[in-house]
């Protein structure tokens, strides 16, 4: 399963995957970016992937913090997630809507 689909299952269906549409004003999107080489050990291969959560709108800081609390230290039988950056203010978009990002490392077994 694609890592973005897995994250959507954790965060919910209202999260956009891989793109940030112009509407609605209040939105959360998740992006995948360059990953590390697989780690091979005896009888096992672990994959590390990186994701970025980007929030936009009047409540974007609160939403980014809530998302960070949900994902940081999340673990199940297939993945473990750790937060790798603080919630970061990236400014306003071309429509003056506030945006924040937060990044995570996802370990897949």
Task: Pin down the residues of each PLM region.
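Small/polar-rich, solvent-exposed N-terminal microdomains that initiate assembly or binding
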Residues: 1-43, 62-69, 74
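Hydrophobic beta-strand residues in large extracellular and virion-surface proteins
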Residues: 7, 15, 30, 53, ...
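A generic structural signal for short, non-catalytic loop/turn and secondary-structure boundary residues
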Residues: 22-24, 46, 95-97
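Compositionally biased, intrinsically disordered low-complexity segments enriched in polar/Pro/Gly
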Residues: 40-41, 45, 83-86
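Oligomerization/assembly interface segments of phage tail-like spikes and tubes
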Residues: 45-59, 98-108
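Short C-terminal domain-edge/linker segments immediately following a structured domain
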Residues: 59-66, 82-86
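Acidic-leaning, charged glycine-interspersed low-complexity segments
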Residues: 73-109
């Amino acid at each position: 399963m694609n890592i973005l689909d897995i994250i959507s299952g954790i965060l919910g269906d209202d999260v956009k995957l891989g793109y940030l549409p112009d509407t609605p004003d209040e939105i959360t999107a998740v992006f995948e970016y360059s990953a590390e080489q697989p780690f091979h050990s005896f009888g096992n291969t672990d994959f590390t992937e990186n994701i970025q959560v980007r929030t936009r709108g009047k409540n974007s800081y609160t939403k980014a913090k809530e998302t960070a609390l949900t994902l940081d230290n999340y673990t199940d039988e297939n993945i473990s997630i750790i937060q790798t950056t603080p919630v970061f203010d990236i400014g306003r978009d071309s429509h003056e809507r506030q945006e924040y990002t937060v990044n995570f490392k996802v370990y897949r077994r």
